[in-house]
Amino acid sequence: MVATGQLPIPQITARRFGARCLPALTDDALYERTGVRVAFTGRAGGVSEGPYSSLNLGNHVGDGPASVERNRALVLEALDAADVPLVVPSQVHGEVVVELDDASPEALDAAREAALAGADALVATVPGIAALLCFADCVPVIAVSPTGRFAVAHAGWRGVENGVAAKAVRALARADAAELGEDAANGYNVYVGPHIHASCFETGADVRKRFEDRFGSSCIPDERHVDLLEALTVGLEEAGIDRARVADAGVCTVCSCDEFFSYRAAGGICGRHGAVAFRKAG
């Protein structure tokens, strides 16, 4: 079912899915209203071993391809989406947004090719497509419209600075404009998954200055750190998002590296957890 009115205020809660009781963070009220399932996975519930243990979803980190494919399948099975085609981009810390506006096999092949060429956000304007992006400290962002359209973005500090999530929201709003008007983004729910928090994100003075110049002093908590969530939220507000509709998981990946992958905590060798969104066709 797709909502025609206002979405419920976003809330991120922990749940276990499927026969394997796979843990993930989600919003059940959103799913009940729109049919859109959003999920932030952790590192438990998969088959990978060593530094990738166990639910590694990234195929670019040194884990075995068969393990990654099995882990991705386990996630879709647990979320009751085993039959939903999956699109996973090659993330490049850029600002390219790939729009998924046709679920036909030919269009999906073209979209996958575009995503594999390098993209850090996917915008799905039709049902029947699942989007997965992978993370280990960077900021996962999922935006959902009352129409059931959605966007998933990967924002490292460069992506936050360059506004990749805001760019995805603007693309989503263009798709919604005929139904929801020019201020469509004001009614979107935004979900921010586990990421490196300000207390663990120490940067050089040059990066702090760039963030302060771009987003204001609210994202600079002290003379050593940058608050990526605050900077991201400022950028999303510029794209029309209501700050009251931005829900943060409240989890720092560095501090919680036993539950989520953290590049910084692991010293560079680790798996990737995921941000997943889909709406089934029919």
PLM feature spans:
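Active-site microenvironment for binding and transforming phosphate-containing groups
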Residues: 1-282
